[in-house]
Swiss-Prot record:
Coiled coil segments of this chain: none
Chain segments carrying region Disordered: 477-504, 580-639
Residues annotated as glycosylated: 119, 435, 443, 495
Chief subcellular location: Golgi
Source organism of the structure: Pyrenophora tritici-repentis (strain Pt-1C-BFP) (Wheat tan spot fungus)
Protein name: Pheromone-processing carboxypeptidase kex1
Catalysed reaction, written as an equation: Preferential release of a C-terminal arginine or lysine residue
Lumenal side: 31-517
PROSITE patterns cross-referenced by the UniProt entry: CARBOXYPEPT_SER_SER
Signal peptide residue numbers: 1-30
E.C. numbers: 3.4.16.6
Family named by the database record: Belongs to the peptidase S10 family.
Catalytic residues (positions): 183, 384, 446
GO function term, MF aspect, one: serine-type carboxypeptidase activity
Length: 639
C-alpha cells in the first residue's frame, strides 16, 4: 500500500483545499481586472496618433449575467478642471455607439472602415464615457429571460456600473460629471441623476460624485405634451392643413388619445392610442405613387423623404457603422466578452419590448426636483417630428420649478429668447431661467450633433463653463444676443502646461493605487498557495520519517482520479447568455426594401415589420421575443 490510512485523510483534505484555491483564482483574477485589461492598443481604421481609449464590459448583475459595455475616450486638452460626459442614447434599447460613431465622438466611420476625426467632437475638454444600456443593448448582454422592465431598475444598474467603473479608473471619480443624451434618454437621464443624488446623500462613507449638469436633446420626457404637439407641429410646418379630411381623421385619433389620458393615462410613460397620432399623420402624408425611396416622411427630419419605413434607414452613416462594429478585429480591439453571442445592432427589439415601464412615472413628474439641485440644458433640432420642439416647449411652459413657472422672470413676464450666431450664421435661440437652459437649433434633425457637431460643442462648453482665456487658443466665433460671453474654442489649440502637469501627477497616483490594489490581491493568493504547499511538504516529511511504504505512482494516480481532478480541469460551465451565435456579418450596403407596406423593414438591419395599427418610434430587432403585434408599438425615439 502506497499510503497508510492515517495520512490519507489529511492529504486528501489538503489536496482538496489546494484544488479549491486554484479553482478560486480565475474568479479573483476576473473580478480584479485592471485598466490594462481595457486599454485599446489599436483601433482598425483609426488615424494616427491613436487617442487614449478604454473599452469592455463591467458586470452589474452576476445572477443573470448582466454586463454593460462602455467605451471611454480621454480628453485631448485640460481647461481649468477635469470634466467627464456620460452619453446615453435612447430606445429603450438603442446603442450609445450611435453617439460615439455618428454624433459627439472623436471618430466618424467612412467607406471601407476608415475612421476620420470628427470636427467638433466633445472630447476636447471632456472625457467621454459611452455606455450601452439597459443590459442587452448594443454590445451589452444579459440572459435572455432577464431583460429589464422599469426605469428604476435601469438607474440602479447604472449606479452599480459607475461604482465599479470609478474603482477601476479612480482618477476620474472627482471629475465634474455631466450626463448627456437624446430621445428616450429623456427618461433615462433624470432617473439616473436622481439615483446619483440619492446615493450621494445616503452613502456618507463613499466619495460623492460631483454631478454638475444634464444635457438632453429632443428628449422624450413629458409624453402628454409630446402627444398633443404632433398636430400643431404638422400645421406649423405645412405637413397638413386644418379643415381638410386628412386633418379631421388625425384630429379624431387625438380625441381618442385624450380620452385614454383622462381615463388614467396621464402618468404613463407611453400610451398606445396616443402614439397613433403621429402614425396617422405619417400614413396620411404617404405618397404610394412616388418613387419607392420617397414615399414617406422621415419622422426624424421632415426635410427628408424615405421609403415605407418613414426614417428607419436614417442617418446614412449607419450603413458604415453597422458593418464596422461587426468586424472581428474591431470586436477584439474593444475587448468584447465571448459571452456576447450576437453581433452589434443599433437597436435591440427584445430590450425594447420588455422595457414597458408600466410601474414607472414619466421623468417630467420629478424633473423640477432635479433642476433644483443640478443645472439642466434641453436642446431641440427644429426639424425633428417624433420628439419635436413644440412638445418640449409646451412641457417647459407648463412646468413649475425653483419658484416660478416656465421661463418667466417674474409673474407674467417671460425671459426673452436670445439669438445665437455661430461662425457668422444664425444657429438658433438660447433661453435661460432658474437653472434651466433651452436651446433650439435651426435646420436640425432628431440627432443634432450629427448635423452640427461644432455648434453642439460650443453649446456644451458654454454650459460647462469652459473658458480658454487662461490657456490660449483662438476663440470660436459664437455670439449670444450679440455678446461673446466666456471664450470657447472648437478646434485644435494649445493646452495649459500647469494644468496638464498637475493632472499628470494625479493620474499617476490614481493608477499606482489601482495597480497596487491588484498586486495586493495577487500577493494574498500567492501566500495562501505557498502556505498550503509548505504544510503539505512538512507533513509529508514527517510521515516519511515515521513510515516507509511503496514509493510507486500508483497510489497518487488513484487518489487524483478518485477526486475527479481530471474531470475538474475539463469541466466547463455554460449559461444561456444570448440565444444566438455570434454574427460577424459585414453589411456592404443598406438592404433593399420590399416596399410591401407601411413600416416594412428589412430584418437584415435587425428591425422588424410594423403594421398600420402600431408604429415604433425607433427600431426593433429580430431578437424581439414578443408577439409581432407588440413589436411595433415601442417608443424607440431611436437614436
Amino acid at each position: 500500500m502506497a499510503f497508510s490510512h492515517a495520512p490519507s485523510g489529511w492529504r486528501t483534505a489538503l489536496l482538496a483545499g489546494l484544488i479549491a484555491t486554484v479553482a478560486w483564482l480565475p474568479a479573483i483574477v476576473a473580478q480584479e481586472k485592471t485598466q490594462a485589461d481595457y486599454f485599446i492598443h489599436d483601433l482598425p481604421g483609426a488615424p494616427k496618433p491613436l487617442l487614449k481609449m478604454h473599452a469592455g464590459h463591467i458586470e452589474v448583475d452576476a445572477e443573470h449575467n448582466g454586463n454593460l459595455f462602455f467605451w471611454h475616450y480621454q480628453n485631448r486638452h485640460i481647461a481649468d478642471r477635469q470634466r467627464t460626459v456620460l452619453w446615453l442614447n435612447g430606445g429603450p434599447g438603442c446603442s450609445s455607439m450611435d453617439g460615439a460613431m455618428m454624433e459627439i465622438g472623436p471618430y466618424r466611420v467612412r467607406e471601407g472602415g476608415k475612421l476620420e476625426y470628427n470636427n467638433g467632437s466633445w472630447d476636447e475638454f471632456a472625457n467621454l464615457l459611452f455606455v450601452d444600456q439597459p443590459v442587452g443593448t448594443g454590445f451589452s448582454y444579459v440572459n435572455t429571460d432577464s431583460y429589464l422592465t422599469e426605469l428604476d431598475q435601469m438607474a440602479a444598474h447604472m449606479v452599480i456600473f459607475l461604482e465599479k467603473w470609478f474603482a477601476l479608473f479612480p482618477e476620474y471619480e472627482n471629475d465634474d460629471l455631466y450626463i448627456a443624451g437624446e430621445s428616450y434618454a429623456g427618461q433615462h437621464i433624470p432617473y439616473i441623476a436622481r439615483a446619483i443624488l440619492d446615493r450621494n446623500k445616503k452613502n456618507q462613507a463613499k466619495s460623492p460624485w460631483p454631478l454638475k449638469g444634464l444635457l438632453i436633446g429632443n428628449g422624450w420626457m413629458s409624453p402628454v405634451d409630446q402627444y398633443l404637439s404632433y398636430i400643431p407641429f404638422a400645421y406649423q410646418n405645412g405637413l397638413m392643413r386644418s379643415g381638410t379630411d386628412m386633418a379631421k381623421r388625425v384630429e379624431e385619433q387625438q380625441r381618442i388619445c385624450v380620452q385614454k389620458l383622462e381615463a388614467g393615462g396621464m402618468d404613463a410613460v407611453d400610451t398606445r392610442d396616443c402614439e397613433q397620432i403621429m402614425v396617422r399623420i405619417l400614413q396620411e402624408t404617404k405618397n404610394e405613387n412616388a418613387d419607392p425611396m420617397n414615399q414617406c416622411l422621415n419622422m426624424y427630419d421632415i426635410r427628408l423623404r424615405d421609403d415605407s419605413s418613414c426614417g428607419m434607414n436614417w442617418p446614412p452613416d449607419l450603413a458604415q457603422v453597422t458593418p464596422y462594429l461587426r468586424r472581428a478585429d474591431v470586436v477584439q480591439a474593444l475587448h468584447i466578452n465571448t459571452d456576447k453571442k450576437t453581433g452589434w445592432q443599433e437597436c435591440n427589439g427584445a430590450v425594447s419590448s420588455h422595457f414597458r415601464a408600466k410601474n414607472s412615472k414619466p421623468s417630467v413628474k420629478f424633473l423640477p426636483e432635479v433642476i433644483e439641485q443640478v443645472p439642466v440644458l434641453l436642446f431641440s433640432g427644429d426639424k425633428d417630428f417624433i420628439c419635436n420642439h413644440v412638445g418640449t416647449e409646451a412641457m417647459i411652459q407648463n412646468l413649475q420649478w425653483n419658484g416660478g413657472k416656465g421661463f418667466e422672470a417674474s409673474p407674467g413676464v417671460q425671459n426673452a429668447k436670445q439669438d445665437w450666431m455661430f461662425e457668422g450664421e444664425a444657429a438658433g435661440t438660447w433661453q435661460e431661467a432658474r437653472n434651466l437652459t433651452y436651446v433650439v437649433f435651426y435646420n436640425s434633425s432628431h440627432m443634432v450633433p450629427f448635423d452640427y457637431p461644432r455648434r453642439t460643442r460650443d453649446m456644451l462648453d458654454r454650459f460647462m463653463g469652459v473658458n480658454i482665456e487662461a490657456i490660449g487658443g483662438a476663440p470660436a466665433d459664437s455670439l449670444i444676443d450679440g455678446e461673446k460671453g466666456p471664450l470657447t474654442s472648437v478646434g485644435d489649440h494649445p493646452n495649459s502646461t500647469k494644468a496638464e502637469e498637475d493632472k499628470s501627477k494625479e493620474l499617476k497616483a490614481a493608477e499606482w493605487k489601482a495597480y497596487t490594489r491588484s498586486g495586493e490581491v495577487a500577493l494574498v493568493i500567492a501566500v495562501i498557495v505557498a502556505c498550503i504547499c509548505g504544510f503539505l511538504l512538512c507533513r509529508s516529511r514527517r510521515a516519511k520519517s515515521a513510515y516507509k511504504g511503496d514509493d510507486s505512482d500508483e497510489g497518487r494516480e488513484s487518489l487524483l482520479t478518485g477526486m475527479g481532478l481530471d474531470n475538474f480541469r475539463r469541466k466547463e460551465r455554460r449559461q444561456d447568455v444570448e440565444a444566438a451565435d455570434f454574427d460577424e456579418r459585414e453589411l456592404d450596403e443598406v438592404p433593399k426594401k420590399s416596399g410591401k407596406g407601411y413600416g416594412q423593414i428589412s430584418s437584415e438591419k435587425g428591425r422588424v415589420p410594423h403594421n398600420d395599427s402600431s408604429f415604433s418610434l425607433g427600431v426593433d430587432s429580430d431578437d424581439d421575443e414578443a408577439g409581432s403585434s407588440d413589436r411595433g408599438r415601442r417608443k424607440e425615439e431611436s437614436r
